[in-house]
């Protein structure tokens, strides 16, 4: 994880400023059971999770999100998991394409409205992955995703942008 001065983190506006609003944010996070040492001066890493029992592409994300959180903690960050709409092609009618832009807007607004310094995107289907990236790209935050999207013969790795046969 790249080290930044705490005051250079985007999340500093939520937790580090000495004003009434930031006092409220710090109070709420303490009410959730976190101590100051858990989050103070650490980058807040959002984990946008499209887990759903009805989406066969995403059924394993519940466990994976916990593993991602452990990795963020180990790297010196403060993880915040946020749920997002899960697009399941076999069950959504008439098509998940109608909902792709909703997920993109939801992703952008989650990142805009919460104190995220970076984000891990958890999506794995042909509409979900582009939607997550469409929404996150507008924020200018560090983004990572470890999922392959694509058909049987070709796949696209979002974190590298390379095609593989």
Regions from the PLM with identified roles:
Residues 25, 37-39, 55-58, 90, ...:
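Short helix/loop capping segments that flank catalytic or ligand/cofactor-binding pockets
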């Amino acid at each position: 994880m790249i080290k930044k001065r705490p005051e250079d983190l985007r999340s500093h506006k939520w937790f580090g400023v000495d004003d009434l609003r930031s006092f409220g944010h710090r109070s709420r996070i303490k009410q959730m059971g976190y101590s100051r040492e858990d989050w103070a001066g650490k980058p807040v890493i959002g984990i946008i999770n499209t887990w759903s029992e009805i989406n066969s592409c995403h059924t394993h994300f519940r466990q994976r999100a916990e593993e991602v959180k452990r990795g963020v903690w180990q790297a010196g960050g403060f993880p915040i998991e946020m749920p997002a709409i899960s697009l399941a092609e076999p069950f959504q009618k008439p098509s998940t394409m109608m909902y792709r832009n909703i997920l993109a807007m939801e992703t952008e607004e989650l990142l805009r409205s919460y104190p995220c310094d970076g984000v891990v995107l958890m999506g794995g289907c042909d509409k979900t992955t582009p939607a997550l990236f469409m929404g996150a790209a507008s924020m200018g935050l560090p983004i990572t995703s470890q999922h392959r999207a694509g058909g049987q013969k070709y796949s696209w790795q979002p974190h590298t942008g390379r095609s593989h046969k």
